[in-house]
Every structure is written in C-alpha cells, then in structure tokens.
Amino acid sequence: MARGLGAPHWVAVGLLTWATLGLLVAELGGHDDLHDDLQEDFHGHSHRHSHEDFHHGHSHAHGHGHTHESIWHGHTHGHDHGHSHGDLHHGHSHGHSHESLYHRGHGHDNEHSRGGYGESGAPGIKQDLDAVTLWAYALGATVLISAAPFFVLFLIPVESNSPRHRSLLQILLSFASGGLLGDAFLHLIPHALEPHSHHTLEQPGHGHSHSGQGPILSVGLWVLSGIVAFLVVEKFVRHVKGGHGHSHGHGHAHSHTHGSHGHGRQECSTKEKQSSEEEEKETRGVQKRRGGSTVPKDGPVRPQNAEEEKRGLDLRVSGYLNLAADLAHNFTDGLAIGASFRGGRGLGILTTMTVLLHEVPHEVGDFAILVQSGCSKKQAMRLQLLTAVGALAGTACALLTEGGAVGSEIAGGAGPGWVLPFTAGGFIYVATVSVLPELLREASPLQSLLEVLGLLGGVVMMVLIAHLE
C-alpha cells in the first residue's frame, strides 16, 4: 500500500529532474552555440565574406542599367529584366540568415552548411577524431541513449496492467500520448519541412505556388501515408489473429470467444497478467472454471467479454505498431548522432545529450503503451531494448556514408524524404487511435485532471526539447 501511494511522487520527482536537466542543457547549448559561432567566424567567415565581396563587386562593376546576360545572373536562373543586383543581394542575405538560424538551432548542421560554401573548411573539422575513436564515441553514445531510458524504467512502480496500477498507468498513458503528438508535430514534421522551405526561400524569383508547394505537399502525403499504413497493418493483424473469433463471438458457441482469447494471449502473456485479469473480472474466471457448461449464466456476459477481448487485441497490435514507429525514429536518431560526431567531439556530445533528453520521456511513454497492451514490465523492457538496434544501424549508416552526407541531412531534418513524415504519421495514429481512447474511460474528477495534466506534460517536454535542438 505504501508503495502504491508513493508512485505519483516518484513520477513527479522524475519529471522535475528531467525538466531541470533540460534547462541545464539549454544553458550549455547556448554557450556551445556561441563558441561554435566564434569558431565559424574564424574558420569560414573570411572565405564567405570574400565570396560576398566578389559577388557584390561584380554587380557594381556592371552597373545598374546593365542587361542580365552576365555570368553571375546566369547563375541565378537568368531573369529577363533588370534587378540582378537586388536578386543577388537578397539571395546572399537570406543565405547568411539561414545559416545563422541553423547554427543556433541545429549544431550538427555546421558540417553541411560549410560544405555548401566550400570544402576547405570541412576536412579540418572532420579530422577532429580518428576513425577508431570516431566509431567508439558514436557507438558508445548510441548505446548510452538506448540504455539510460532502460534503467529509468526500473523506477516506475508499474508491474502489469492490473487494477492497483491502473490509475498510475493511465497517467503514464496520457503522458505518452502527449509525447507522441508533440514529437510528431514539433519535431518530426518541422524537421521534414525545413529543407523544402529553405529551398523555396533561396529562389525568390520563382512563384511560391508552383515550386514551393510540391515538396511540402509530399511531406503531408507521407504523413497521411504513415497513418494509412498503420491502419492497414492493424486491420490485417486483427483479421489474422482475432477476426474469426470476434466475428462469431456474439452469436455462436462459447468456444469461439474463448479461442479468440487464447490467440490474444500468445503475444504478451504472463502469470502476472493472468492473475490480474482474474482479479479484475470475475466472470472471466467463472468461464475458465466452468468451461461454458452453464450457458444461461454465461450468456448475458458473453458480449461484454467479446468486447473486452477486442479492445485487448487492439491494444496489443497498437503496442507493436508503436514499437515499429519507434524503431524508425531511433534509426534517425542514430543517423544524427553519427553525423554530429563526424563534425567534432563537442558537437557529438551536445547532440547526444539532446537526443537523450528526448528519448527518456519517449521511452517512458512507450513502456506505458506496452504494459497497457498486456505485456509485463520485464517483457516491455525487453521489447524496448530491441529498438536500440535501429539506433545502432542509423549510427553505422551515418559513419559508413562517405562524408556523412546522408547523416548530415538526417541530422538537419531532411534525410530520405519519407522517413521523418512517415514516422510522424505512425506516432499520430498510435496516439489518437490507440492511446487517447483509453483516456476516455470513466474516472474520478481528480484522475481525469491528472490525465489531462499528464498529456500537457508530454507536450511541454517536447516543446522544451525542440528549443534545445
């Protein structure tokens, strides 16, 4: 009993601890960005200013009344009428502010942006670590972000989906839904849109309605594709695993409903879950002991049990779908870490801390979804540990790619154009279809308030982490 009463206090202490750590990293990030700005000025500014002077001087040398057949205007899409100087100046000033914004918000984009101005600055930065040390740092950081949340889960006093843990589990589920939605709308989708929006801004002479809407529209389509794909997978799994039992559970023999129950248990079944279900629903225990011999007594409760089994199967499928989305998300995190360590040790450490702060609340939410899906605490932790394979694969991919080009694009939010928005669609589907409906169950006013606060807490956590990135 004392342990149950202390559970919300542990959750509150954990959230406050991570919020404090986030503020500390924010201060560290600001200081590190200032240092990187100074380093950027020292290493690359002279080259870029000379480049700017060359462009600017060339425009003045040809005069304001000149035609636009000069070699520089040919480089800027060859317009027919005379605003070469304005176009070039505007393009360069935008490029400068674009780099400043990226340098403040994404430390791991330094390598990519410097490469755009010339390769002279990049090799000096990339040789900060030799090959063996680079792999050791990057893989070690990836293991850290995968193992740290794993140990945090030991502090959560939830063993299974049982009545005595139900209130705390519901709060964790609300936190998970807020984290999933915040991650999708504040992290994945904005990062997927960034390279496309910058591409359109770098070409001010073109119409925004044609060249700008295409890539942005593709991001939205990939988000919808993720939602539809997860829907199709869930319907397929439900049809294969429980469709027969559910379709006949209401009107046929008791053995059909019972068979559906047996199928659902094969995925995540433990003695703890079995005992908790017997504790929670006496009618199910009566069915197991009597084997359906007393039809009149079991008849009235059969539709309710079929509905409960359908809900349980839906939750189990959604738990595994969430793991699939988390695997893809961890792959992009691994790419970001690998690319950042190619840019330097300090940059890699800062990126690792940011990803770690992002992963801990995310993994807590995934843990709650798996437990709600019927897994025990140990099973949920093992399944989450498997998602570390995606992070390790992403890190290795970023390190093996020549020059870290793919890793740099992923770290800056572009990556393969479909990965981030497709993953965001998966997170949106799991949060809205599987998790949020669980929060609509009847509860006391205090419990409902705590669930709403938990959802807002997950969103606020992602807002803080978005500022760090």
UniProtKB/Swiss-Prot annotation:
The chain crosses the membrane at residues 10-30, 138-158, 169-189, 214-234, 386-406, 410-430, 448-468. One of its GO terms (cellular component) is endoplasmic reticulum membrane. Transports Zn(2+) from the endoplasmic reticulum (ER)/Golgi apparatus to the cytosol, playing an essential role in the regulation of cytosolic zinc levels. Acts as a gatekeeper of zinc release from intracellular stores, requiring post-translational activation by phosphorylation, resulting in activation of multiple downstream pathways leading to cell growth and proliferation. Has an essential role in B cell development and is required for proper B cell receptor signaling. It comes from the Eukaryota. Methylation at some His residue by METTL9 leads to reduced zinc-binding. Rapidly phosphorylated by CK2 following Zn(2+) treatment. This phosphorylation is required for efficient cytosolic Zn(2+) release. Keywords: Endoplasmic reticulum, Golgi apparatus, Ion transport, Membrane, Methylation, Phosphoprotein, Transmembrane, Transmembrane helix, Transport, Zinc, Zinc transport. The modification Pros-methylhistidine is found at H66. Its main location: endoplasmic reticulum. GO terms for biological process: B cell differentiation; intracellular zinc ion homeostasis; regulation of ferroptosis; skin epidermis development. It is found in: Endoplasmic reticulum membrane; Golgi apparatus, cis-Golgi network membrane. It is a multi-pass membrane protein. The gene is SLC39A7. Homodimer. This is Zinc transporter SLC39A7. Belongs to the ZIP transporter (TC 2.A.5) family. KE4/Catsup subfamily. Residues 242-263 have a biased composition (Basic residues). InterPro entries: ZIP. Residues 42-56, 66-114, 264-285 have a biased composition (Basic and acidic residues). GO terms for molecular function: zinc ion transmembrane transporter activity. It catalyses: Zn(2+)(in) = Zn(2+)(out).
